[in-house]
A protein has these predicted regions:
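Amphipathic alpha-helical transducer elements in NTP-driven molecular machines
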Residues: 4-8, 24, 31, 35, ...
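Terminal-proximal interaction/regulatory segments of ATP-powered molecular machines
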Residues: 476, 843-849, 853-863
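Short flexible coil/turn linkers enriched for glycine and charged/polar residues
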Residues: 17-19, 80-82, 123-125, 135-138, ...
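Extended, charged coiled-coil "arm/hinge" scaffolds of SMC/Rad50-like chromosome-maintenance ATPases
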Residues: 503, 507-541
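Charged catalytic and DNA/RNA-contacting regions of genome-maintenance
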Residues: 1-335, 348-364, 368-460, 585-587
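Charged, surface-exposed helical/loop "interaction arms" that form contiguous linear patches used
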Residues: 365, 382, 396, 400, ...
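ATPase nucleotide-binding head domains, primarily ABC-like/P-loop NTPase cores
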Residues: 35-38, 234, 304-305, 309, ...
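Extended, charged helical/alpha-beta scaffold domains that provide interaction surfaces
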Residues: 29, 456, 463-487
Length: 863
């Protein structure tokens, strides 16, 4: 193999340290990729694949492709979105000043969980990197969003530990997960990461989770001993947190000084929602299309700031269990709901607030440019007015927010004094610092501007001295400043001119005076560029030192934005304040589905009442036809409960919500082909999880249990599940149970606490009208054939279905009907059909005309 060039040797040495990354290797104005990286990148990014000499003898070529450094971000984003890791290798010194090969090193590794660039992130959601570590049946979970500085940790233990691990991962929806210890051995977790969470999963080496090292990392990062963090007796948590911190530091290279607070929480603080419940209730995206539109988040999120949008999603993912904390939010929402003028003023102010959290993260990590600083400065403008507005509000939560919210006027002024209003994108090319900010910079700029005046003076003097009227002074990068004289006038050039270049149209010369001026101007320009970067870096570092203030203000502004949004929604949609307590009761008057009523727009949504408690009204059996609205109603109840525990007003006339610890759903069915499970197996697995984990404080939404198997098997399973859920000694949870098994309605007479309800239907001849109203009692019919007709089944199929239904209801055997060539049903084939039997029983010979007409009318009714 040919001897490597110094640059290729340098590349391979760096690549060897990061074999799992695509290496973006900076060469001048480009990031280049070589060998296998180049082949992969050219395919993924549609780049032209070329070659470069690998060795000095030029006998061996290596594949190469590249992207301009100023547009690299978009290419990196595409690679990271597809799950690749990208290592950024920068030039660590100015190539013009380097002696020999330019020094290069990795400055950052970009992975799905470490993105901080605004163009690569969804501003409305956090971008979490998670870590799960397990030992002896106990698991520690940590979640960090380095784009905002948020850091959470929790634990899971006992028989339900893995279920809780998966539930928490579903709550945070991380972009990347690191797992180690017992967590790395869990097939269930591995399958969930791959199939249900669709996130990038990394296996952590055992040494990454070493107890002593991880404990020290956690204490150093958060500035507190483990006991003050509440982690002394939770080694699996600090080992998870420490491993995550170490991984992030290795990837970021610049440290995590903006990650200041570890928020440890326990399972009793928030409502539990498993992956099925989140999916079935369509909290953040719809089940079919995976879109925000049509989800609960779509209804709720009209926040004015990116920070508020992220906090609202967090509140949605973590509904509260404490009535005190819920009511504190509701008090604030109520005050703003009643104060429309104050609310509108807040909305107007919030529109001008920038994303402090993510700008601060870029500042601290050294990734912020001048435009980020200007955005931060401009975004601070509304803060004094926001403080004044909050000061006039009375709810206790506003007092807390006022204490947290800093007007940041000193930082705003510093940015405005230092940075021009419209700075360039690059921080290495000058043009950033405002005149008057630095005396030295102003002097250098005077030299450059004065030098331009001097050049004009020299040009005028030389024309006068030589008598050459077309003489001009110019500049190019090769020769610097020069005097150009046209060909016909070169005889007039004085001997003091030094010829540098011959052109077809003339000659170019230099003079000692011109070269001295050139050195002065170019030296000043270089110094200006370097000094501007120094001054910018000083401002950025000072802002980084103040990042704690900015982050506190960001959290306060985000909470204010969410509360204002909730109030505006309540006023706009006529929501009511729910009464929150620990009674276990669930009483809703004229409740509405928050999403459906907005999707319907002009159509009238029919409201419904709900009455559930832990006693005589524990279970509501809901019967009625498909398409009548059973599933919508049950989801509606669950969403109202969830919204109430977020601290939001709810779509109802009145609502009393006894706090619910978990919401379970079994709605819909689909095969899990990836794991080889049938519809019925998926259904039974989910039901088993519900019955295992539900408590008397839970809300169960069970739709069509048992429909995936035979009628009698399904009915038996549905009844057994219903009895188990209703039994106070086992669960006794508040339950909405929709079923087509009308035989189950008899349970109302057998088990205390079970009540029958149905969806009211009105028949108009052969047509049915769904009234969408929940009324007491069992349904008298499922109207399945009528629903099939409404769905558009062919008339012949519907007619045949009616015949078969009548035969089944009468207990007569059913046989296949032979079809004639003209598609008409053959009367001779209907040997046991009810219509045939009726015809055979008629004594036509003895009938009067009136009797014949009546008989014909009866026969027509049988069709």
């Amino acid at each position: 193999m040919a001897e490597l060039t110094p640059m290729m040797r340098q590349y391979l040495e760096i690549k060897e340290r990061h074999p799992d990354c695509i290496l973006f290797f900076r060469l001048g104005d480009f990031y280049e990729m070589f060998a296998d990286d180049a082949k992969l990148a050219s395919h993924e990014l549609d780049l032209t694949l070329t070659t470069r000499d690998r060795g000095k003898e030029k006998s061996e070529q290596v594949p190469m492709c590249g992207v301009p450094y100023h547009s690299a971000e978009s290419y990196i984003a595409r690679l990271v979105a597809r799950g690749y890791k990208v290592a950024i290798c920068e030039q660590m010194e100015d190539p013009a000043l380097a002696k020999g090969l330019v020094k290069r090193d990795i400055t950052r590794i970009v992975t799905p969980g470490t993105v901080i660039e605004s163009s690569m992130l969804d501003e409305s959601r956090n971008n979490y990197f998670a870590c799960v570590f397990g030992e002896d049946g106990r698991y520690g979970l940590s979640f960090c969003d380095i784009s905002t500085g948020a850091f959470y940790a929790t634990q899971a233990e006992g028989a339900e530990a893995m279920e809780r691990v998966i539930s928490e991962l579903g709550r945070f929806a991380p972009a990347e997960v690191l797992h180690g210890g017992d967590a790395a051995k869990s097939e269930e977790l591995t399958r969930t990461l791959q199939e249900r969470l669709s996130c990038c999963a990394d296996l952590g080496a055992d040494e990454l989770f070493a107890p002593q090292e991880t404990a020290q990392l956690v204490e150093k990062q958060f500035g507190k001993p483990l006991d003050e963090l509440g982690l002394t007796e939770r080694p699996e948590v600090w080992r998870s947190a420490g491993a995550l911190l170490r991984t992030l530091c290795e990837l970021q290279k610049t440290g995590l000084s903006h990650v200041r607070e570890l928020e440890f929480y326990v399972s009793g603080r928030f409502m539990e929602l498993d992956l099925s419940a989140r999916r079935n209730l369509e909290l953040t995206e719809t089940m079919r299309a995976g879109e925000k539109r049509g989800s609960l988040l779509w209804v709720l999120d009209h926040t004015k700031t990116a920070m508020g949008s992220r906090m609202l999603r967090s509140w949605l993912e973590k509904p509260l269990l404490s009535p005190k904390r819920i009511n504190a939010r509701l008090d604030a929402v109520e005050e703003l709901t009643k104060n429309s003028i104050g609310r509108d003023e807040l909305v107007h102010m919030l529109q001008d607030v920038s994303d402090y959290e993510r700008v601060t993260a870029r500042i601290v990590t050294g990734a912020a440019n001048c435009r980020d600083l200007v955005s931060l400065g401009n975004g601070c403008e509304p803060l004094p007015e926001l403080r004044a507005a909050i000061g006039g509000l009375h709810a206790s939560m506003f007092g807390v927010l006022l204490d947290e919210l800093d007007d940041l006027s000193d930082l705003r002024d510093e940015i405005r004094n230092a940075i021009v209003d419209e700075p360039p994108f690059s921080v290495r090319e000058g043009g950033m610092i405002r005149d008057g900010y630095s005396e030295e910079l102003d002097q250098l700029r005077d030299i450059v501007s004065g030098g331009k005046g001097t050049l004009a003076r020299i040009e005028a003097e030389e024309r006068e001295k030589t008598g050459i009227k077309t003489l001009r002074v110019g500049y190019n990068r090769v020769f610097g400043y020069y005097i150009e004289v046209s060909k016909g006038q070169t005889a007039q050039v004085p001997e003091t001119y030094i010829r540098k270049q011959t052109l077809t149209t003339g000659e170019r010369y230099i003079t000692p005076e011109l070269k001295e001026l050139e050195r002065t101007i170019l030296t000043a320009k270089d110094r200006i560029t370097a000094l501007e970067y120094e001054l910018f870096s000083q401002v950025r570092q000072h802002l980084a030192d103040q990042s704690a203030r900015i982050q506190r203000t960001a959290r306060a502004v985000a909470a204010l934005d969410v509360l204002t949004d909730f109030a505006a929604l309540a006023a706009r949609q006529n929501y009511c304040r729910p009464e929150i307590d620990l009674s276990g009761e669930l009483h809703i008057t004229d409740g509405r589905h928050p999403v459906v009523e907005q999707v319907l727009k002009d159509a009238l949504f029919v409201p419904n009442d709900t009455a559930l408690d832990c006693g005589a009204n524990r279970v509501a059996i809901l019967t009625g036809p498909n398409m009548a609205g059973k599933s919508t109603y049950m989801r509606q109840v669950a969403l109202i409960v969830l919204m109430a525990q977020m601290g939001c007003f709810v779509p109802a006339r009145t609502a009393r919500i006894g706090v619910v610890d978990r919401i379970f759903t079994r709605i819909g069915a689909s095969d899990d082909l990836a794991s080889g499970q049938s519809t019925f197996m998926v259904e039974m697995t989910e039901v088993a999880e519900i019955l295992k984990h539900a408590t008397s404080h839970s809300l169960l939404i069970l739709d069509e249990i048992g429909r995936g198997t035979s009628t009698f098997d399904g009915m038996a399973i549905a009844r057994a599940v219903l009895e188990y859920a209703a039994d106070k000694k086992r669960i006794g949870a508040k339950t909405l149970f929709a079923t087509h098994y009308h035989e189950l309605t008899d349970i109302e007479q057998e088990i205390e606490g079970v009540r029958n309800y149905n969806i009211a239907v009105r028949k108009r001849g052969a047509d049915i009208v769904f009234l969408r109203k929940i009324v007491p009692g069992a349904a008298d019919d499922s109207y399945g054939v009528e629903v099939a007709r409404l769905a558009g089944l062919p008339d012949k199929v519907v007619s045949r279905a009616r015949e078969l239904l009548r035969a089944l209801e009468s207990g007569a055997p059913v046989r296949t009907v032979r079809v004639a060539a003209d598609d008409q049903i053959s009367i001779t084939s209907m040997e046991n059909d009810a219509l045939r039997r009726k015809l055979e029983s008629l004594a036509i010979e003895t009938m009067t005309p009136i009797e014949a007409m009546n008989a014909l009318f009866e026969l027509k009714k049988m069709l």
